[in-house]
């Protein structure tokens, strides 16, 4: 009997693992999985000045192979994915993990925070380039499959991208179920095409020997260094393996990489290389030239589907990253909509969606060809990869307590490779690499302005703050008129009197029969268990102090907090008998120490245009009382 139960449990576990692997293949590997469309073609770009030869083909294929082995398989899949923050991955999760042992006021804390935020900002540059280059390179297959449609490549690309962003509002949970199967077909097609071409010139397999990569670098020196920036295109999307770890877990992602994705990609790259050895004229577009003529149009359709899926993963990542940044205090509150009742991670951020739409379409129209976009691609990703290595080194030493010598050896080994790719990509700045850097830098500046501005607002508020408990004691000694119902005061600091309470007492001169103060605290972990979320302290006379803790991947829910606190608070808070009091701060730039005047004005503008607290906390407008207050910074 027990053996039967064990067998059943094992079988169910295997089924779940397979389902998770398929799901991961559909979401995690979209970006890196569509790189064969343009990576090898860009490596042989005439602008690099590398004369076509058998040695060049073997050298470049060897570099592609070892780049994937070292950066993706060793660094990300086997090493970085160990640095999970309660199961969550991504650069902000890694930053939060690295800060656990840092002094809150130390320079180390500030430096690690800035590094993590800057790395996250670079993702926004990637989020603009990825959809543009992926869909455009897929549609360029029409130039080979149906030359008469060549003039329509750009318009079709724009239409596909516009449609992709327009459907975000309704959510993608329904079509999302097709992502895994479609990407499985895509990787199967990559593997099959690669295998067919590989059999025509199996001698390409000698490129697994790193001697060919070293010889290529030695022979061509500076030109080979330039090519290294194009070789990096096979690695774009590697960061997603770590970033999406919280959705699928490390094991399904590792299985998906080693047993499906990596073999398919390597077969395709080696197949493209074999085809170049047999027919050098195919260098203009090795991917589509490797496809039999009768299958070229179906392959364009499949490639379009795969690139849309890759783009969707990046767009969803931008929504998720924005939500995390809001919780960590780096971004003003924005309206966030949940597009699925089953999946809490499926969210829609309107402001981010429309900004990405405008930028992506603008990039496609400005660069026009995937070759031109390839020059802009990579530098943002390499920046994030370098920062990931640095933060991982901090985690190794301060959290895992590894031996300093081992930390140095491991981190330096990865850092040498990262810096080689980063340096090679710096050469692309003039040809378009400036765009993602400029975009990421602008986002970083805005985020740091908001973060610094919020610190100043908190500091000014604390200067004039009144300790809550002595104030309540004095208030209850000479109580104002008590009225029926419940008043909920949202406050940033549970130890001080909310400005909204002071204004309510000043103007209305009443106190509700039940008063609840709620303060939200964001922890350095992604999720907080409901059992540990709410702490309630009864002050007496119907007054309660509630502290609600949330992870940086969660969005505060006032109603849920009231439900969790009900056993201590008493009777249920009925919506129609509850008023929510919120202080609406009006920021006034001044000559007080803090930021320069123009940055203070920028912060004031961001503050004014952020989502109202009632919208962010999803409180019905007719139950909210907003009381204004001015804060000089």
UniProtKB/Swiss-Prot annotation:
GO CC entries: plasma membrane
Ranges that cross the membrane: 20-40, 52-72, 109-129, 147-167, 178-198, 221-241, 257-277, 299-319, 347-367, 376-396, 404-424, 431-451
Molecular-function annotations in GO: potassium ion transmembrane transporter activity; symporter activity
Keyword annotations of the record: Cell inner membrane, Cell membrane, Ion transport, Membrane, Potassium, Potassium transport, Symport, Transmembrane, Transmembrane helix, Transport
Intracellular or extracellular location(s): Cell inner membrane
Family annotation (InterPro entries): K+_transporter, K_trans_C, K_trans_N, Kup
Catalyzed reactions per annotation: K(+)(in) + H(+)(in) = K(+)(out) + H(+)(out)
Taxonomy, superkingdom: Bacteria
Membrane topology: Multi-pass membrane protein
Coiled-coil zones: none
Similarity comment: family membership: Belongs to the HAK/KUP transporter (TC 2.A.72) family.
General function of this protein: Transport of potassium into the cell. Likely operates as a K(+):H(+) symporter.
Identification of the protein by name: Probable potassium transport system protein Kup 2
Gene for this chain: kup2
